[in-house]
């Protein structure tokens, strides 16, 4: 009940090319304590570029993101609209309208290095119009939802991830 007061810190950042980008995917890695942003496209053959910024609470001035890797080319990687990193850091998921893609991350490996490999596609994806929200509960369960209507459901995916995916070609 009532209002809750919170402290808010602001991170001012820009992209290495100095231009604004269309990005809807913001992910935080608990393992490396790094923020990752995936933009929607870079006007080349690759769709979606991964950028990072080490997370701190004492930023001063403008921070410049580091460009890491491109997601890949083709329909699987077009217009990423959401993503998340599992709390233990072992899995990364990114979605667009037609696909959900999962990367498995090896111990000691960076998120960017893991995402430089080909992902696996979630076969059981219940397609959502305007499906942009996705969040891991743990390393085996995640939720998705859409913002296209007033009464949109929240989908929970709980199958063994290894049984629910197939390789992306």
Predicted segments, located by residue:
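Sequence/structural signature of beta-propeller domains
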Residues: 1-164
